[in-house]
Amino acid sequence: MIASVRGVVTATGPDHAVIEVGGVGLAVQCAPGTIADLRVGQPARLATSLVVREDSLTLYGFADDNAKALFELLQTASGVGPRLAQAVLAVHTPETVRAAIANADTAALTRVPGIGKKGAERLVLELRDRIGPVPVGGDGAAGVTTGAWPEQVRQALVGLGWTAGQAEQAVAAVAETVDGEVPPVPVLLRQAIRLLGRTR
């Protein structure tokens, strides 16, 4: 199993990054918040989880081992595969997910595209006793503020399945709320997803 990768970022997209390790470029599937912290040409380390299927080998990457552990735990619930587990971490921080499951906050879980009320209830039922300690206070978001945040958020939303038009409207709405210091990209992304969730 490939537990982590360290190397130079050679490319990024809405849902993946390419990390060059020993002359080999590894395509790593990542949540938008993780990609937002990567810079092409700069070194990076990602905790990784290798998902093996009959016809594919897919490497998923995370900012830290906490997110990776939650990704793997989510997949032990009925009906949750790697793509849905990754979508959960695209919408919420690991701390928020743990709190939502521990507190049976199905409303927070249904903000994730692909999770309905029954799916959220199933996650709570199956994982509540295994979710681990829930941190108190803060949402755990972290990121590097850049002037290019609108494009980063727009690309991330399209990568999560919304149309370019929907992404544009959400970015415009979020931009109106930004006053002074710009929050980290993952925070802005979650705000945009919440706005889009209300209009679905």
Swiss-Prot record:
Its main location: cytoplasm. GO terms for biological process: DNA recombination; DNA repair. Keywords: Cytoplasm, DNA damage, DNA recombination, DNA repair, DNA-binding. Pfam families: HHH_5, RuvA_C, RuvA_N. It comes from the Bacteria. Residues 143-151 are annotated as: Flexible linker. It is found in: Cytoplasm. Residues 64-142 are annotated as: Domain II. Residues 1-63 are annotated as: Domain I. GO terms for molecular function: ATP binding; four-way junction DNA binding; four-way junction helicase activity. The keyword Cytoplasm applies. InterPro entries: DNA_helicase_Holl-junc_RuvA_I (IPR013849), Hlx-hairpin-Hlx_DNA-bd_motif (IPR003583), NA-bd_OB-fold (IPR012340), RuvA (IPR000085), RuvA_2-like (IPR010994), RuvA_C (IPR011114), RuvA_C_sf (IPR036267). SMART domains: HhH1. Belongs to the RuvA family. The RuvA-RuvB-RuvC complex processes Holliday junction (HJ) DNA during genetic recombination and DNA repair, while the RuvA-RuvB complex plays an important role in the rescue of blocked DNA replication forks via replication fork reversal (RFR). RuvA specifically binds to HJ cruciform DNA, conferring on it an open structure. The RuvB hexamer acts as an ATP-dependent pump, pulling dsDNA into and through the RuvAB complex. HJ branch migration allows RuvC to scan DNA until it finds its consensus sequence, where it cleaves and resolves the cruciform DNA. This is Holliday junction branch migration complex subunit RuvA.
